[in-house]
Amino acid sequence: MSDIGVFNAAVGADRAGLRNLKRVFWNLEAPGLYEQALQRGEAQLAVGGALVAETGIHTGRSPKDKFVVRDAETEAQVWWDNNGAISPEQFDRLHADFIAHAEGRELFAQDLYGGAEPAHRVRARVFTEFAWHSLFIRNLLIRPERDELATYEPDLTIIDLPSFKADPARHGVRSETMIACDFTRRIMLIGGTSYAGEMKKSVFTYLNYILPQAGVMPMHCSANVGGAGDSALFFGLSGTGKTTLSSDPARALLGDDEHGWSPKGIFNFEGGCYAKTIRLSREAEPEIYATTERFGTVMENVVIDPVTRLPDFDDASRTENTRCAYPLPFIPNASPTGRAGHPKNIVMLTCDAFGVLPPIAKLTGAEAMYHFLSGYTAKVAGTEKGLKGPEATFSTCFGAPFMPRHPSVYGNLLRDLIARHHVDCWLVNTGWTGGGVGTGRRMPIRVTRRLLTAALDGSLAKADFRRDPYFGFAVPTSVPGVEPHILYPVKTWQDKAAFAETAKKLVEMFQANFKRFEAHVDADVRAAEPTMSIAA
């Protein structure tokens, strides 16, 4: 076996059990990875210099194929209702077969950090079969200085072999595709899928497992910080505006997806962004668009013209989930440190396709925990096959697939931090107003931005509020620059009876979903549940 590149020779591939490899390319930077990816036919070059790769049949994550080793350590720690389990013996067979499959192959290795705060970072070593995967994860995680590589020792090892096909009977998994996590031995295996996002989310899953024990809150959120050091967190599921609304020219971007909250403040887990590109335009999102024209960016499943190599961001023939991965410094106002003080504001974003939630509401600590555990948004027809109308989605902690522990662990951590640091919390509806999908209209982005500006500059917290009779939280009675009736959802509907019926339906959905958490929360959190205080 030959090694090419800079690495700690005392802790080589054999530490991960890998042996009889043809070659390992260690910590190659973008030019070297471009050469390898293009020579191997893994990717194409787009106009401007981005590397474009396809992922085949897997154009998104495979959450049902993700498994955690159930052993003496994890038995009482992992939320098994939400995480598939395999035995240590099944993982041993899987790991041995992974090692055998890798023999004779060339692999790419990246030594990286997950976490911008040194005291709470994980050293993640990622072995990949594809050169473009190596560039992807190099873009997404935090890159050590070159002189750190000679003494780097990994805490976590990830091996990603898309050509490996699992045997469900032998390995205890569901299909040929699998993501297997051994938290005790700190090994993660990814096979049978070329979707690069699995690597990024594997690191996130590991951090979500280990950090709560250290009193650090891991979060699926974006974050930014103002000139006065006033930071803000934006929680939200896909399609709620998390990336768009945290991108503010007046505020520095910490990150767009994964953060931690420690006794020192908040910090990004990553060193890059993984932005959706479907229908991306230079006019609407100029900073993200500019990254697609830069050398070093990886574009995933984006259709490009075979002759001109121009990308067509409106083409969803492969998937709606087209993306680009780029280092954070590609964004002009990105924070150079990825760290900030304790947040002044927390924003929970929801896309309410039923059109009954107000555009903004102020939450108490108990209400914030309730809505964090609920993780509500709504899917709209067209986003998923077979979906005819709005469908409520509850993804606890705004990221259920990545949460190994019980949601109450994260919810209680968040609630304690909110109370300790006197954080203002807001629920923001970026969905529909004046009716649901089909009868109403999308909440104007200018309204949402105006409300967020007032929330983040502190003026909204001093406004007059009314108690929403359907959902119980506090809603401002007026905000400068926002039409008053928009703050009263029922006033935006022509059919008041239909509004009441729809609101009642959504309240009942919240109540039904939260039953699974009632035994794990205090009475004040249970009391924060929507209860319909008026007859409807």
From Swiss-Prot:
Residues that, per the record, bind ATP: 201, 220, 236-244, 285, 323, 448
Family membership: Belongs to the phosphoenolpyruvate carboxykinase (ATP) family.
One GO term of the biological process aspect: gluconeogenesis
Functional note: Involved in the gluconeogenesis. Catalyzes the conversion of oxaloacetate (OAA) to phosphoenolpyruvate (PEP) through direct phosphoryl transfer between the nucleoside triphosphate and OAA.
UniProt catalytic activity: oxaloacetate + ATP = phosphoenolpyruvate + ADP + CO2
InterPro entries: PEP_carboxykinase_ATP, PEP_carboxykinase_C, PEP_carboxykinase_N
Cofactor: Mn(2+)
Residue positions binding substrate: 61, 195, 201, 323
PANTHER family to which the protein is assigned, alphabetical: PHOSPHOENOLPYRUVATE CARBOXYKINASE (ATP), PHOSPHOENOLPYRUVATE CARBOXYKINASE ATP
UniProt name for this protein: Phosphoenolpyruvate carboxykinase (ATP)
Source organism per UniProt: Methylobacterium nodulans (strain LMG 21967 / CNCM I-2342 / ORS 2060)
Keyword Kinase: no
Cell location: Cytoplasm
Cofactor binding note of this UniProt entry: Binds 1 Mn(2+) ion per subunit.
HAMAP family (alphabetical): PEPCK_ATP
One Pfam family recorded for the sequence: PEPCK_ATP
